[in-house]
Amino acid sequence: MFNRLRTATFAVLSVLAAQVCAAPVTLDVTGWKGGGAEPANLAALIAKFEKENPDIKIKFEYMSRNDTTTVVSSRLQGGNGPDVLMVDRELMRQWQGAHQLLDLSSEKWVPTIWRGVRAHTQIGGKTYMLPMELVGIGLFANLDLLKRAGVAMVPTDVDQLKAACGKLAAAGVTPMLLPAKEGWAPAALVIASGLSAGDADARAESFVGAGSARFAADPAFKQSVAALKVLADAKCFVPRLNDGVSAWSTGLTEFQAGRVAMMPQGAWNIAKFSATKGLSFQFAPLPALVSGNGPVALDMLGTAWAINAATHQPDAAKKWLAFWAHPDNDRRFLDAEAGFSPFEGGTDAMPPQAQPYAAAQKNGHVVLYPKGVWTGGLFTAIWNSMSAYFLDIGQDPAKLLARWDGAAR
């Protein structure tokens, strides 16, 4: 009797133990994609991951980029941060500096990161994030409006822009919108052309830190700023009117409505513009503002995944990152974002309208947007100065660039 009872008890305990062992691990993941206006196919990818890894359950929490900076930072500091965090280069630097991110250097996917991006996922030669996308910043051009004015191709430099603007204005078409309320759009043009005059990564690094190069003394940056006045004088845009236009609202509406021929913006708008009936457009590289230079594909290293150094589920977290490193999975994300793959041999998801941009990128006419290399304070100074420049576009470019130098120190 005792032996039968002991055997039965052991059997029950074995079943309970097996159930405990079989219980799925819950992985807390936060990100600013996957909700709001950018679902980014994340729900489908989570479902696919859970199907392939039935022992892991993803608990995804959507929060904005701004909230991520404050809320997640506080949770990490308090020891109750998520297991996996969506990051960008700026957040990677911040959290790695506080020793809050796991070193991923030994992961199998590290050598597959595109060589032009790999260094930007590292600090001190160690890898701390898995990149998810490269997103282009380029020039949107309304092909019907260009054709109406007799402009055969999207301009690639200042001289072509001036000629195109003259034809467009003569045809009664607003040639260009350069929204300057936030300063972002004109700054993107200047940064792309300024950094393209040499090794872009090295130049970006050279302008920050003690004893570094000076924007105000750099010929390429001075010429790039001055070129904006040249374009204004050529009737490409009206500076004071553009100073009141937001790149994130009014500017998008104006281009989408077919009321402007050209506007610099990000590839993340391609899906929205493609869904607009009757809007025929191309997404091209940014035109060169520096004499002798070619057009520039301004690539921005977008979102990435990192792992909390204090996670209790490191193996499950690494499986989540390895899942995203697979080209078929990342492609589904890129399809929604109209992005480039950050992996060697990865498949890009750029639609036909973006082929001019893709060609420039593949030909090496690329500048990586220096977010994470330049501080948030420097970018704020850049954007504010560009907005102010549109109120007084006759000012000396060197004086404007001196404000950048002050913020870079």
Predicted feature residues:
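Glycine-centered hinge/linker elements that transmit conformational signals in sensory
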Residues: G166-K167, G209-L241
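Hinge/lid segment of periplasmic solute-binding proteins
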Residues: R89-G138, K162, Q282-A284, A354-Q355
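Conserved C-terminal helix/tail region of periplasmic/extracytoplasmic solute-binding proteins
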Residues: K147, K362-R409
